[in-house]
């Protein structure tokens, strides 16, 4: 089974009148900004060029104890309960929290582990190659191609690739962000040891408080959501540690923490930032955040709003609607954009749905809770306490 490769005549702007189902059958060939994902993998210093075009049209969800994939053809208008097309159920998994594709189309799973609940799975980051993903229909429990375990990990949850291909991992348990170089991630696949010390241990001069969501904008600025602090920090690219002058560390616990001062702090205003979980940038550079607290909303802050410290009122607020007795947003966690500007939001609490909002639903602030264009919900989906989400290659 190989990745689905279809030619694309349009990117982000389908022909007027084209049905969403038809649009979703077209493969989006992602440009430089999409080489490392629309949900926070833009350039830091310079671009990391992939070896192949990266596609961005299948839905991948970190789902309790596994990872599931839904094909674009399954993301049809209305409410449905499709069974996952593929399931990745590696025996090493404890509690997958986040999913991210690198510039080569390999999948990285951020796993918080289950030690705290009495299990044996250590917190780790795992890589599964294109070849392994292509073979999931025959072997849905492959051993990871790369395993990164670190003495620093306590409960890693989300990650973003910068433009160099380095991985930035947020750890809500330790209130730190860890940076692993491409070379470190590659080396861990060729050595017997899976323990890797981060190149950088990033802290904030104004302490992180349960950092989860993490995303780069188009200029390489880094944004981190403080789930425990009801704030979002923004760090200018120029203030981030310069990885060009770093050498790979050899001490088990890595280097001393590097404190960085936030350039921007966005604070809660009337529930606008309430237990923020996921972060994602749209194609216009606007920042979207999911509120996993009582608000259960997904909100947008414009480029101008995130340029300065304050408590901005969201430009757009997507609240939960009720469809067939099911709430569409319940403690939303992961959010992500596909190549056409559609937004997916995952509910981590029952009924464990995935709400998909089309670009036309994201242009203006709705006067009432919008009904998602696409709503996946029901037992057949196998969704159970899902968390992270991303769009990536479709394997058919």
Name these PLM-found stretches.
Residues 66-69, 123-127, 175-181, 230-234, ...:
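A short loop-to-beta-strand structural motif that recurs across blades of beta-propeller domains
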Residues 44-55, 91-106, 120, 150-164, ...:
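Beta-rich, blade/repeat-based domains predominating
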Residues 44-91, 96-99, 107, 126, ...:
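An edge-strand/N-cap motif at the start of beta-rich repeat modules
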Residues 82-90, 142-150, 196-204, 259-269, ...:
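A short beta-strand motif characteristic of beta-propeller blades
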Residues 2-5, 11, 23-24, 32-61, ...:
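Bacterial Sec-dependent N-terminal signal peptides
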Residues 64, 112-114, 120, 172-173, ...:
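Short loop/turn segments immediately following the C-termini of beta-strands
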